């Protein structure tokens, strides 16, 4: 059971036309650059602490936390009210794409409240006794953070129901006619759950959270501030223009922004004098196959397959997965959210559709039928 305590320290040629789709089918069948996928997939790095440097990159207080203004305001009010009443904070469910700071927020909450935060994930809670061991060892008003909470087993989830509502554990002792239920009192605590699939949670579990908050993608100016802050911590020299360049290609995700910054820093130190300018940032990101819109090879491949093989769509996600060799769940959870956010992909009742902006970005001329479909 993995537990961490907070106290422990190829783009298509622009000359191609839709009518040439079949003849250029092979353009999307090249070998897949592995480095790019690792750079731009938010879940490529685990949320748990992996080193002192990664720990330093996390803001420790909300006044250091950049972005998510509305969420911070809601939580600040809750923190002040909770501290004045000397109560445990209401249970909190955070949902949204990976890499937006759900674990960081739980650690900040613990710091603001002056309590401990135990960090774990649902897959690590394989047996009921795992969650029981965590709950009985929590101190008053402590925070228990469970990542990927939608993956809890049924038995573990049912143990949480009375724990969340009444701060007690109902444990069945014995079997058959001799079985009896024993209730163990728990100290008041706060459960913070994180998920990328809020719809996968059962209603009984979801309804027991006092707060249900969504984390949104970050704006480019917010990511620019994050890049500058990270560069300062890493003692990397970077210009504001270079920070903006990294931010624009970070898919609205701080984790990706920090990862790209580290790779650009490596490039600047090896190929240049060490200072990161906008030109050097552009060179490095082009080397890593990250285009100015933040699309990597796989993003462009998905869109290219839709355009070349299905005339832009509509096409079902399972069909698209089979045509590209990607997993349908990965397409839905990793690639689609950002493509939809920047307006390159639409979900319709008939399937996925590449928008005119996607056609233009990849160097194609959108057909009239595709324009009418989206009108």
From Swiss-Prot:
Polar residues biased stretches: 1-22
On whether Protein transport is a keyword of this UniProt record, the answer is no
Residue ranges of region Disordered? 1-44
Chain sites annotated for binding DNA: 347, 352
Which amino acid positions bind ATP, per UniProt?
A: 57-58, 99, 102-104, 165-167, 208, 218, 255
Q: Which family does it belong to?
A: Belongs to the RuvB family.
HAMAP family listed in its UniProt record: DNA_HJ_migration_RuvB
Please state what the protein is called. Answer: Holliday junction branch migration complex subunit RuvB
Q: Which organism is it from?
A: Acaryochloris marina (strain MBIC 11017)
């Amino acid at each position: 059971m993995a537990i961490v305590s907070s106290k422990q320290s190829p783009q298509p040629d622009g000359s191609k036309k839709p009518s040439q789709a079949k003849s250029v089918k092979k353009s999307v069948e090249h070998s897949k650059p592995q480095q790019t996928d690792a750079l731009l997939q938010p879940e490529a790095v685990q949320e748990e602490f992996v080193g002192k440097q990664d720990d330093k990159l996390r803001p420790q207080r909300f006044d250091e936390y950049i972005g998510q203004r509305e969420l911070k305001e809601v939580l600040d009010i809750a923190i002040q009210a909770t501290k004045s009443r000397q109560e445990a904070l209401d249970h909190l469910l955070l949902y949204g794409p990976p890499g937006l700071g759900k674990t960081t927020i739980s650690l900040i909450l613990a710091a603001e409240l002056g309590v401990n935060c135990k960090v774990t994930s649902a897959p690590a809670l394989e047996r009921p006794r795992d969650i029981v061991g965590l709950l009985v060892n929590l101190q008053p008003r402590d925070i228990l953070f469970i990542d990927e909470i939608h993956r809890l087993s049924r038995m573990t989830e049912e143990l949480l129901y009375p724990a969340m509502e009444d701060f007690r554990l109902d444990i069945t002792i014995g079997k058959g006619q001799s079985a009896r239920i024993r209730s163990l009192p728990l100290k008041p605590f706060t459960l913070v759950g994180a998920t990328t699939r809020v719809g996968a949670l059962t209603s009984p579990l979801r309804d027991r959270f006092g707060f249900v908050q969504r984390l949104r993608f970050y704006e480019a100016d917010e990511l620019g501030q994050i890049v500058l802050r990270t560069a300062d911590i890493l003692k990397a020299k970077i210009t504001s223009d270079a920070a903006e360049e990294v931010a624009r290609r970070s898919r609205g995700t701080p984790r990706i922004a920090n990862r790209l910054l580290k790779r650009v820093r490596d490039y600047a130190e090896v190929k240049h004098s060490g200072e990161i300018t906008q030109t050097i940032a552009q060179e490095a990101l082009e080397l890593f196959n990250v285009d100015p819109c933040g699309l990597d090879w796989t993003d462009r491949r998905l869109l290219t397959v839709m355009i070349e093989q299905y005339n832009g769509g509509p096409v079902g996600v399972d069909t698209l997965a089979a045509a590209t060799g990607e997993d349908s769940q990965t397409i839905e959870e990793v690639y689609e959210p950002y493509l939809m956010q920047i307006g390159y992909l639409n979900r319709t009742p008939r399937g996925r559709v590449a928008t005119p902006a996607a056609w233009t970005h990849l160097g194609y001329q959108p057909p009239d039928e595709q324009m009418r479909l989206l009108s």
